[in-house]
Each structure stands twice: as structure tokens, then as C-alpha cells.
């Protein structure tokens, strides 16, 4: 039969789930237990499953296997979950995970393990753990460093796993960092909520079949210590029946030699004289996987006769002759009644059961005139209540405090297998705060998968002293080894918040229980048997089990009514199985609204933690963080939206201001141009000419464009005579003035001017700054201004009115010409002004204010009219 001890070799978790079962290797002397995801198992087989090491070993010759065959290349050990490497060797999966440079060739099957990227200096480091315990193995394999930046210590991954130094950073997120701390800096990881400390996972090795067949454990009793006044534990009291001493179950005795053999077949009898507890009391609470399941062994009912009690034994008055038979899977009492089965039994539960059984036996012996002093230090029934209602501040319970007070200490003499057996028994988790699977799923797993019987050999738990100083330990080396084995017991801790709620709830329940003074009576006529009343927050068995698993079971003060048989605080169970729950219901009903709310809160949280396949508390913490982050992002988004609207409004205001500035700048530029023209066309700088002599040009006649819808009689061609003119200051006309304006100014004459011809050369200099020297197109003003006399006769008032009327739509050159007319007072005649006013009725002429100038018609040739 296969003995399943411990959890996963990689993650040290003892739970299995439907999508990630915990699988045990079926190889000979192999204790490998891994999760499907932790070991990279592609498909879980229906039959037997073998790890990679056992699969390889089965194909090798028996004599070719030695200690170095399967030794890990990253540590000095050859046990555990191993995988093939790229160097044709072996390496632990846990070593590959915690050394960053190691990777897997296939991440799904997690093999082979690639070691080429591991730096050489990691193989040269010294493991400080091995250096203290096994100096020869200190330099073997590769070491990981302490995650503390200033720490220089290094150690093997498997050594850190045995010491409980491995951690996972960022366990709440998907990016998990596998790291480890030395013993000096481990406190940092324990205090950091973002770091998950992996519990210690000591290796469990089996002996060979020859050594495992038959073993002997020698137990020698020592002087008994005084009974402890209190016992701190978190397990529920097991209901028992205390009518007669013959019905007492489990009253054991001490022996000198115990023969530990394999479990006899069904129906056989073991006459050993040793107290044999039910195997389920020693079974670690392993959650069965979808493939691997544990078939519960039949628990042998134990009986003891009243006549066998005497004063000769070291533990009890006489050596009780016990008959243990494997007849039923449920513990059966002598009177035919059955004990309620427990879905999960721990070391603490077993010890409390034994305490109750022995106390009940003491009460029965007291009723039969046997003094309590004959029980060799065991408490009487009147002292039992002090053990029942004590709720500890923590669920961290040592083995010494779990064992019955007054029990003898034993020296363990024998082979190493007994040490491993006791170690496997005592290192089982005391209470489970994690989720477990219900019994229905376990039964379904058992029907689909190959059953495995729990064949752990029975053993007797020796007690360590529970005094204030920790108790005395035996001087033998075996007892010292036993103490070292049970020292690293891992017990999960209840949070401060839960402990406060437990204390408040317990006080409220005690007050409610004390308020009830009327005892309950059974309505059935049959004989009634009493059990200790347990006032719990949860009234049904499922919630009670969940509270036991979470370490939050509440026990009310039990009375000392075991001697009398009835009590005011006892729940009554009738013979036909029905219960009178009126008193218990009244005790469980909350008296205040706060109690009701706390009860609903506890029931909901226990239900979630018991049935959910994930860490509910951690998930709630993640949801709260997500909600806070979402709220922060919403506030940030609202602020950004307000900022965007503000910038849009500011941009629109700036655009309006920019448009106004452009218009003002254009107007200022026009005024500046007018001032420049007025400055350059000062009339004092122009010398009057005698007469303009018209002369035919030597080249082809100049073509002047005319509007298409007006008569040529209103306009005259401007001809360029060849005659030269004389000036006192030839350089008075600057080049910045438009040439057309300069030509017009040169044709201006007075009545007293001489008759000398003037060479204006208008045709070759008619240009604008925009055309860069090209001949300037004729405008209505230029064609209308054909006589210098008419231009000079235009009054300044009329020229200013004409300029104001046509300023906005005029071209820059036209505006310059009108400005020039304004600057010659008394030299423009009224007839020219009248002609200019008539031009706005023609196509291509001047337009009213606010309308752009229309395009001019194509130029046409014009002949001189002789004027």
C-alpha cells in the first residue's frame, strides 16, 4: 500500500484541484508528489503514474544505479521532482525555477532543463547551509543568492526549501519573481504583504522493503509532570457517550515494547496491549486530486473492560488489554452507537479526543468509587470544563501543548523509519485556513481513480512537557532526534482582524448562554444520552467543518455534567436520532443587530473560503485595489477633459485677437504707404516745364487697353515723346515711387511753362513692385488722366473725397495716384473729377466701397486722337 505524506515537492501546497490535481508517483520507494502544473504533466493517466526519475530507473539495469546517477546538477541531492537536462543529467524543477538563468526547453512539459546560460560563478559559490551541516556538499551544484541587495550569502535552492527560506514576490499579479532570503533577512519577507513565504518542505524518504517490513519501537516512561491547568487548542471536542465505563473508547496504556507490523487483514485481531488510535487521527489533511485519492482505512473500535483497571500501569492503573478489529470504516462504540465521522482530522483533534476520552473514563471510574488519584495525574471530570472553552490567541500550537497533560515522556529507540513516521505524523498541519474540497468531490474522485489505502503503521505519540520553560527532554539521542523532527511544525496564523472578531463573538455567545437558565428536555420517551454543548456561530455541520478548517471554531464553556448525565447547556439527542434543538437554537439566535451582521459576515466568508478554488481574501484585496485605481483614473480623465475644454476656449479667443491684429496691421501699412508717397512727391522738388511736345514715336505705336463698354472719346492715349527735358535736379524723383505716378507728375505743367518738349519715357517704365519690371496694365484712372491740365485743375477737396470713397477696394497703385492728386492743391480741374466719377458706371472702372475690382478686359490697340 502507498503512504502519501506531504504536499507538492515544488510549491509545498497540500491541496489539489480539479484542473490542477496533486499526483503521487507510483515508483518504488519514491515519495514524489507534484501538481500537474508544477511538474508539466501534459495528461493525467488513469492508471499508475511515474515521475521522470522512476521512468528512467525502470529502464536501467539494477546494478547500474548509484547515488550519483540521479543527483541534481544544481544541488547535492538526488530526491524530489527531477527533470532531464540538456547535459544528459538531472535537475530539480524547484532549482530550475529559483535560479533565474535556468530555463526550460519546453515550457509546457518543463523539460529539458537548459543550463547553458548559468554563469560559472554560481557554480563556484559556497552554500552556507551545507557549510554548517555538510561541508563536503557546500561547493556542489549552483547556488542562489539572498534577495537582500547588501547580503552576500548564497545557498542551494533545496537547502533553502528545507529551511523555509524560499519566497514569491508579486504573488497577487501574474509576474511572479522567485527569490529567497537567508535566515537573517527572512524577517523582511515575513513582514512584507507582497511577499509570499513558501513553507518549509522537508524531504521524506522511505526505507527499503526489507527495513520497512517489521520494526520495533521501545518506549520507556519517565516521571510524570504535574497536569497543566489549561490546554490551548483549536479543535472541536468529539461527542462521546459516558453511560458506563465499558462504553468508554480509547483508554490506552503504556507498554515497554511495541511491534509495528503491517496492518492485519479484515477480521483479524491484534493483541498488543498498546493504545492504537484510529488511523485518521494521524492522517495529514491531504486534499485528494482528480487522479490520486486516499481510501480511508477502517478505524478499529477499541474497547476496555472495567475489570482490567488496576493500579499497576504507569499511565493508567492497569495495562488494558485491547482488542482492535478492522470491521467498520466508522468508529463503533460498545453499545452499538457510532461516532460522527470527521472530514478532516488533525493532530490537535486527536489529542483533544484522547483527552475527552480519558476524562470521561475518569468520570466513570469516579462513579464506581474509584478515586481520581488512581488515574495517575489525569484530570477528573470536574476539571474538564477548563479544557473545553479556552480559545487561544493564536492557532500556533506546539506538540507539547497538544498532547494530554500528565502524559509520560518516552525515549524513542529504534531505526530511522520510526523517526520518519513520527515526523510525518507530527508535521501534519494543525488547522487549515485554506480552502478544501468537500467530501462529495472526494468520493467522486475515489470512484474514478485507483484507490489507495492509507497503510500508515500505528504509533504512540510521546508527549513533551508543556510547562512554562518548554519542558524537559529526554537525554537519549533518539529523543533529541525526535525533538528536532517535530520542531519545524508549520501552523498557519489567523490574522489580527479575525482574532478580534473571534474574541468578540465568543464573549457575546457566552453572555447569551449564561442568560439561558432553563434546561432543555427531550420530547421522546426513549432514553437520552447527553453530549457537551458546543455553541458555534454555524449551526449546520458544513459551516462547523469550515470553521474548524479555518481555525475559528468557537466553544462555549462546557459544564461538569458528565457525572450527572444532564446539563442546562447540553444539547439533547434522543435514541431515534432526532435532536431537540429548541435550547441550542435559542443559544444561537443573535441578541443584537451587530451579532446578526457578524454572523452573516462569518457565514458568507466561510462559505466562500471553503468552496472557492482561489484565495478569496487575496481576490477581494485585488478588487479593492482595482476599484481604487479605477476611481483615480476617472478623476484623472475628468481633469484632462476640463483642461481640454479650457484650451479650446483659449484657442478661440486667441484666434479672434489675431484676426483683429491682422486687419489693424493692414490698415497701418496702407497709411504708412500713403505717408511715404506724400513725402516723396513733395511739389517743391518738381521743376515746372514749359510745354509738353507731342511727337510720334520711332517704334510701333503704344497700345493702351480700353474698357469694352465705353467710348474712346473719354480717354486719350498717353504717348512717349523722344524729346528730352531739362531739370535743375534730375535725381529728385526716387525709384521707390511707382513709375506711372512719376510719369503723370512729369506731365504736369503750368500756364507759364516754356514750350520745350519733355521726354517722360512712360512706356518703358510703367511697372509695379509686384510685376518686377513688366509693363503695368492700364487702369481707369491712368486712361482717364490724359491731360496734365485736367489733373492739375482737380481741387484737393474733391481728390480727398474720391480717395476716401474708393480706398478699400483700390489697388495700391491707384491709391498712390489719388494720394498724389490730393497733394497738388489747385492743380486738378473740375472736368477731370467729373470724368473720374463717371467711370464707376463702366465695366472695369472704379467700384463702390466694400466691393473688389473686377478684372480688366484684354488690352486693345488705340490710335492717337491728335489731342
Curated annotation (Swiss-Prot):
ZnF locations on chain (PHD-type): 5-57, 125-186
Feature: compositional bias, Basic and acidic residues: 503-512
Record site: Required for binding to histone H3 methylated at 'Lys-4' in vitro: 4
Annotated source species: Caenorhabditis elegans
Low complexity composition bias: residue spans: 538-550, 574-585
Keyword Zinc on entry: yes
Gene Ontology CC terms: chromatin; chromosome; condensed chromosome; histone methyltransferase complex; MOZ/MORF histone acetyltransferase complex; nucleus
Classification via PROSITE patterns: EPHD, ZF_PHD_1, ZF_PHD_2
UniProt biased composition (Polar residues): 285-311, 516-527, 551-573, 758-771
SMART domains linked to this entry: PHD
Disruption phenotype: RNAi-mediated knockdown results in developmental defects such as slow growth, protruding vulva, and a reduced brood size. RNAi-mediated knockdown results in germ line defects, resulting in no embryos or impaired oogenesis. RNAi-mediated knockdown suppresses the multivulval phenotype of the lin-15A-lin15B n765 mutant. RNAi-mediated knockdown shortens the lifespan of daf-2 e1370 mutants.
Highest taxon above the source species: Eukaryota
Function as written in the Swiss-Prot or TrEMBL entry: Recruits the histone methyltransferase dot-1.1 to chromatin to methylate 'Lys-79' of histone H3 and activate transcription. Recognizes and binds histone H3 methylated at 'Lys-4' (H3K4me) at the promoters of target genes. During stress, the zfp-1-dot-1.1 complex also plays a role in the deubiquitination of histone H2B sites, which negatively modulates the RNA polymerase II-induced transcription of highly expressed genes. In response to stress, binds to the pdk-1 promoter to negatively regulate pdk-1 expression, which negatively modulates daf-16/FOXO-mediated gene expression.
Name recorded for this polypeptide: Zinc finger protein zfp-1
The encoding gene: zfp-1
Record's keyword annotation contains DNA-binding: yes
Primary localization class, coarse: nucleus
Subcellular localization, as worded in the UniProt entry: Nucleus; Chromosome
BP GO annotations: chromatin organization; regulation of transcription by RNA polymerase II; regulatory ncRNA-mediated post-transcriptional gene silencing
InterPro entries: AF10-like_CC, AF10/AF17_PHD, EPHD, Histone_Mod_Regulator, Znf_FYVE_PHD, Znf_PHD, Znf_PHD-finger, Znf_RING/FYVE/PHD
Tissue expression profile of the protein: Isoform a: Expressed at high levels in maturing oocytes, but at low levels in the rest of the germ line (at protein level). Isoform a: Not expressed in the pharynx, germ line and tail. Isoform c: Not expressed in the germ line (at protein level). Isoform c: Uniformly expressed.
Region annotated Disordered, chain positions: 267-311, 440-477, 503-586, 753-773
Comment text on domains: The PHD-type zinc finger 1 most likely mediates nuclear localization. The ePHD2 domain folds as an integrated structural module comprizing the C2HC pre-PHD-type 2 zinc finger and the PHD-type 2 zinc finger. It mediates non-specific binding to dsDNA, but does not bind histones in contrast to many PHD-type zinc fingers.
Subunit structure: Multimer; in vitro. Interacts (via C-terminus) with dot-1.1 to form a heterodimer known as the zfp-1-dot-1.1 complex or DotCom complex.
Example GO molecular function: zinc ion binding
Keywords: Chromatin regulator, Chromosome, DNA-binding, Metal-binding, Nucleus, Repeat, Transcription, Transcription regulation, Zinc, Zinc-finger
Residue spans, zinc finger C2HC pre-PHD-type: 69-102
Annotated stretches, region: Extended PHD2 domain (ePHD2): 69-186
Amino acid at each position: 500500500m502507498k503512504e502519501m505524506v506531504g504536499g507538492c515537492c515544488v510549491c509545498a501546497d497540500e491541496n489539489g484541484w480539479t484542473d490542477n490535481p496533486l499526483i503521487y508517483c507510483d515508483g518504488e520507494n519514491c515519495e514524489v508528489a507534484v501538481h500537474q502544473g508544477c511538474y508539466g504533466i501534459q495528461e493525467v493517466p488513469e492508471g499508475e503514474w511515474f515521475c521522470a526519475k522512476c521512468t528512467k530507473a525502470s529502464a536501467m539495469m539494477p546494478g547500474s544505479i548509484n547515488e550519483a546517477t540521479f543527483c541534481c546538477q544544481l544541488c547535492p541531492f538526488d530526491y524530489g521532482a527531477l527533470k532531464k537536462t540538456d547535459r544528459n543529467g538531472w535537475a530539480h524543477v524547484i532549482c530550475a525555477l529559483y535560479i533565474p538563468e535556468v530555463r526550460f526547453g519546453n515550457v509546457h512539459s518543463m523539460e529539458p532543463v537548459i543550463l547553458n546560460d548559468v554563469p560559472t560563478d554560481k557554480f563556484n559559490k559556497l552554500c552556507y547551509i551545507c557549510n554548517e551541516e555538510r561541508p563536503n556538499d557546500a561547493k556542489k551544484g549552483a547556488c542562489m543568492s539572498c534577495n537582500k541587495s547588501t547580503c552576500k550569502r548564497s545557498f542551494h535552492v533545496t537547502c533553502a526549501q528545507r529551511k523555509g527560506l524560499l519566497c514569491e514576490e508579486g504573488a497577487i499579479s501574474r509576474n511572479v519573481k522567485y527569490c529567497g532570503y537567508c535566515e537573517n533577512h527572512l524577517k523582511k519577507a515575513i513582514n512584507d504583504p507582497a511577499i509570499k513565504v513558501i513553507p518549509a518542505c522537508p524531504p521524506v524518504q522511505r526505507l527499503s522493503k526489507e527495513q520497512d517490513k517489521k520494526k520495533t519501537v521501545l518506549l520507556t516512561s519517565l516521571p510524570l509532570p504535574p497536569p497543566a491547568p489549561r490546554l490551548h487548542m483549536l479543535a472541536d471536542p468529539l461527542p462521546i457517550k459516558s453511560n458506563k465505563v465499558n462504553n468508554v473508547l480509547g483508554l490506552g496504556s503504556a507498554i515497554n515494547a511495541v511491534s509495528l507490523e503491517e496492518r492485519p487483514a479484515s477480521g483479524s485481531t491484534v493483541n498488543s496491549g498498546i493504545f492504537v488510535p484510529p488511523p485518521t487521527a494521524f492522517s495529514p489533511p491531504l486534499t485528494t486530486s482528480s487522479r490520486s485519492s486516499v481510501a480511508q482505512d477502517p478505524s478499529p473500535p477499541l474497547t476496555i473492560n472495567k475489570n482490567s483497571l488496576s493500579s499497576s500501569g504507569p499511565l493508567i492503573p492497569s495495562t488494558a488489554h485491547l482488542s482492535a478489529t478492522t470491521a467498520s470504516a466508522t468508529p463503533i462504540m460498545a453499545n452499538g452507537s457510532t461516532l460522527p465521522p470527521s472530514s478532516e482530522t488533525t493532530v490537535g483533534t486527536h489529542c483533544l479526543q484522547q483527552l475527552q476520552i480519558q476524562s470521561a473514563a475518569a468520570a466513570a471510574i469516579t462513579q464506581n468509587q474509584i478515586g481520581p488519584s488512581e488515574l495517575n495525574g489525569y484530570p477528573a471530570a470536574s476539571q474538564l470544563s477548563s479544557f473545553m472553552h479556552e480559545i487561544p490567541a493564536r492557532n500556533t500550537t506546539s506538540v507539547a501543548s497538544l498532547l494530554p497533560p500528565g502524559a509520560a515522556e518516552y525515549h524513542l529507540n529504534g531505526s530511522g523509519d520510526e523517526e520518519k513516521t513520527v515526523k510525518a505524523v507530527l508535521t501534519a498541519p494543525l488547522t487549515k485556513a485554506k480552502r478544501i474540497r468537500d467530501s462529495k468531490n472526494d468520493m467522486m474522485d475515489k470512484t474514478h481513480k485507483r484507490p489507495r489505502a492509507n497503510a500508515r503503521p500505528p504509533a504512540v505519540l510521546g508527549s513533551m512537557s508543556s510547562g512554562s520553560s518548554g519542558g524537559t527532554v529526554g537525554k537519549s539521542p533518539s529523543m533529541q532526534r525526535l525533538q528536532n523532527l517535530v520542531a519545524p511544525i508549520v501552523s498557519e496564523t489567523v490574522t489580527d482582524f479575525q482574532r478580534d472578531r473571534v474574541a468578540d463573538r465568543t464573549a457575546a455567545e457566552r453572555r447569551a448562554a449564561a442568560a439561558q437558565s432553563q434546561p432543555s428536555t427531550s420530547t421522546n420517551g426513549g432514553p437520552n444520552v447527553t453530549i457537551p454543548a458546543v455553541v458555534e456561530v454555524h449551526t449546520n455541520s458544513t459551516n462547523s467543518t469550515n470553521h474548524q478548517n479555518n481555525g475559528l471554531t468557537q466553544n462555549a464553556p462546557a459544564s461538569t455534567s458528565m457525572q450527572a448525565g444532564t446539563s442546562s447547556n447540553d444539547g439533547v439527542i434522543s435514541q431515534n436520532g432526532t435532536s431537540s434543538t429548541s435550547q441550542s437554537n435559542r443559544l444561537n439566535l443573535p441578541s443584537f443587530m451587530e451579532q446578526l451582521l457578524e454572523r452573516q459576515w462569518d457565514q458568507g466568508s466561510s462559505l466562500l473560503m471553503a468552496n472557492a478554488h482561489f484565495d478569496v481574501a487575496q481576490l477581494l484585496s485585488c478588487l479593492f485595489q482595482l476599484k481604487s485605481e479605477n476611481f483615480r483614473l476617472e478623476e484623472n480623465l475628468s481633469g484632462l477633459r476640463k483642461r481640454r475644454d479650457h484650451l479650446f476656449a483659449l484657442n478661440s479667443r486667441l484666434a479672434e485677437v489675431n484676426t483683429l491684429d491682422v486687419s489693424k496691421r493692414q490698415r497701418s501699412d496702407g497709411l504708412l504707404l500713403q505717408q511715404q508717397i506724400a513725402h516723396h512727391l513733395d511739389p517743391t522738388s518738381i521743376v515746372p516745364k514749359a510745354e509738353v511736345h507731342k511727337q510720334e514715336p520711332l517704334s510701333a505705336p503704344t497700345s493702351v487697353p480700353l474698357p469694352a463698354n465705353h467710348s474712346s472719346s473719354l480717354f486719350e492715349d498717353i504717348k512717349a515723346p523722344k524729346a528730352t527735358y531739362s531739370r535743375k535736379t534730375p535725381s529728385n524723383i526716387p525709384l521707390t515711387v511707382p513709375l506711372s505716378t512719376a510719369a503723370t507728375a512729369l506731365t504736369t505743367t503750368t500756364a507759364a511753362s516754356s514750350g520745350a518738349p519733355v521726354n517722360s519715357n512712360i512706356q518703358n517704365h510703367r511697372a509695379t513692385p509686384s510685376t518686377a519690371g513688366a509693363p503695368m496694365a492700364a487702369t481707369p484712372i491712368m486712361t482717364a488722366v490724359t491731360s496734365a491740365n485736367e489733373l492739375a485743375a482737380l481741387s484737393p477737396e474733391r481728390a480727398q473725397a474720391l480717395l476716401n470713397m474708393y480706398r478699400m477696394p483700390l489697388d495700391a497703385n491707384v491709391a498712390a495716384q489719388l494720394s498724389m492728386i490730393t497733394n497738388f492743391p489747385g492743380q486738378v480741374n473740375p472736368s477731370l473729377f467729373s470724368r473720374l466719377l463717371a467711370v464707376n458706371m463702366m465695366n472695369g472702372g472704379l467700384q463702390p466701397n466694400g466691393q473688389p475690382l473686377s478684372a480688366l478686359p484684354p488690352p486693345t490697340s488705340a490710335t492717337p486722337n491728335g489731342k
